[in-house]
């Protein structure tokens, strides 16, 4: 039976993976309230289509940070893709390159940045970085990303400590130990004779540290994890180039706002001065359309990419991207939007249910 929607890929992926691997991918923090709300919140939004327009040509292309992508559907940073498929991030990168969309590669990828870039040398990529206490480490990672042609840095800000992920605890999966081991291996590759202290993301990283980061790179800096107007305003004050509205897929602090709900607050705060993106809960083309109508420049996919990877490797990731893009194209056509630029808040209303 063909897999025709993202829900099909989810169901099939679960059958392909061990319970521990599946729980790591799907795991949520605490009671999973935010995890569920990310999806449910989209369903409280209704569409207001316009008809009797010439819809013979519909274009899903847009730009992020000045670079064109085929659709406003990109790939979020998620760790350890080899859990889902042996080639891991290399397969993901090849699929993203073929689709002509942005792939944000995680600090905790299964393969080195060099190996991933070699697998898809023409791909459009950003690098996600967890800031560490060791600034030599931070600078080294930034320099590697610059040398490899990454176009932006994505700084995840919502992880001063890991969320309480009960599934991983029940499975006795020590994620923090795995992350520390990954750091140590990466540093030993660069400095094999030097003993380097390794730490989990720096809990004390704060707004004032952004200036130090900006002093060591010319790449645009995108902050991932903002959920409030106050932090959005501070982000602009500190001259970042973009924001990803995100609650880490409901894996960090439970009972925070769904990403699509927080998006409205953040977009209103930035007033179009910097680009705003979002991730969390996107499962259909209508979800993408709603996020764009509320002001997102593009959406990023996390778990669905891993579902595709678990099902069919590179081909599965490409199918997930193709399905969502086709759904968006159809939804735009049925809503009267010839281009992404025509998608506006007038397209939506909020259900009273």
Curated annotation (Swiss-Prot):
Domain FMN hydroxy acid dehydrogenase: 2-353
Catalytic activity annotation: a (2S)-2-hydroxycarboxylate + O2 = a 2-oxocarboxylate + H2O2; 2-hydroxyoctanoate + O2 = 2-oxooctanoate + H2O2; 2-hydroxyhexadecanoate + O2 = 2-oxohexadecanoate + H2O2; 2-hydroxyhexanoate + O2 = 2-oxohexanoate + H2O2
Cofactor note: Binds 1 FMN per subunit.
Active site feature: 248 (proton acceptor)
Location(s), subcellular: Peroxisome
Cellular component annotations (GO), alphabetically ordered: peroxisomal matrix; peroxisome
Cofactor field: FMN
Regulation: Is inhibited in vitro by CCPST (4-carboxy-5-(4-chlorophenyl)sulfanyl-1,2,3-thiadiazole).
GO molecular function: (S)-2-hydroxy-acid oxidase activity; FMN binding; identical protein binding
Residue positions binding a 2-oxocarboxylate: 130, 165, 251
Summary of the function given for this chain in its UniProt record: Oxidase that catalyzes the oxidation of medium and long chain hydroxyacids such as 2-hydroxyhexadecanoate, 2-hydroxyoctanoate, 2-hydroxyhexanoate and 2-hydroxybutanoate, to the correspondong 2-oxoacids. Its role in the oxidation of 2-hydroxy fatty acids may contribute to the general pathway of fatty acid alpha-oxidation. Can also use mandelate as substrate. Active in vitro with the artificial electron acceptor 2,6-dichlorophenolindophenol (DCIP), but O2 is believed to be the physiological electron acceptor, leading to the production of H2O2.
Protein name stated in the entry: 2-Hydroxyacid oxidase 2
């Amino acid at each position: 039976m063909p897999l025709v929607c993202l829900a099909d890929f989810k169901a099939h992926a679960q059958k392909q993976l061990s319970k521990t691997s599946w729980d790591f991918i799907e795991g949520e923090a605490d009671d999973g309230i935010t995890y569920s709300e990310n999806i449910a919140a989209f369903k409280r939004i209704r569409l207001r289509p316009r008809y009797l327009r010439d819809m013979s040509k519909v274009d899903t292309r847009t730009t992020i940070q000045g670079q064109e992508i085929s659709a406003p559907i990109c790939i979020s940073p998620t760790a350890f893709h080899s859990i889902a498929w042996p080639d891991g991030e290399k397969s993901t990168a090849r699929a993203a390159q073929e689709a002509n969309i942005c792939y944000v590669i995680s600090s905790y990828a299964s393969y080195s940045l060099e190996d991933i870039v070699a697998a898809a040398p023409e791909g459009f990529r950003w690098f996600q970085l967890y800031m560490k206490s060791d600034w030599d480490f931070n600078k080294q990672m930034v320099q590697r990303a610059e040398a490899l042609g990454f176009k932006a840095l994505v700084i995840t800000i919502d992880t001063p400590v890991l969320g309480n992920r009960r599934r991983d605890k029940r499975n006795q999966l020590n994620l923090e130990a795995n992350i520390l081991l990954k750091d140590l291996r990466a540093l030993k590759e660069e400095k094999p004779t030097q003993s380097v202290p390794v730490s989990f993301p720096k809990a004390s990283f704060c707004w004032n540290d952004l200036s130090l980061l900006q002093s060591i790179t010319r790449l645009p800096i995108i902050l991932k994890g903002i959920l409030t107007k106050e932090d959005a305003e501070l982000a602009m004050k500190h001259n970042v180039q973009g924001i990803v509205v995100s609650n880490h897929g409901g894996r960090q602090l439970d009972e925070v706002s769904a990403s699509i709900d927080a998006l409205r607050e953040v977009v209103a705060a930035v007033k179009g001065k910097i680009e705003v993106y979002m991730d969390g809960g996107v499962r259909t083309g209508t979800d993408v359309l709603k996020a764009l109508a509320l002001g997102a420049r593009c959406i990023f996919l996390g778990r669905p990419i891993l579902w595709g990877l678990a099902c069919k490797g590179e081909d599965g990731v490409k199918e997930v991207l193709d399905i969502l893009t086709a759904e968006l194209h159809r939804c735009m056509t049925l809503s009267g939007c010839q281009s992404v630029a025509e998608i506006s808040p007038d397209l939506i209303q909020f259900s009273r249910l």
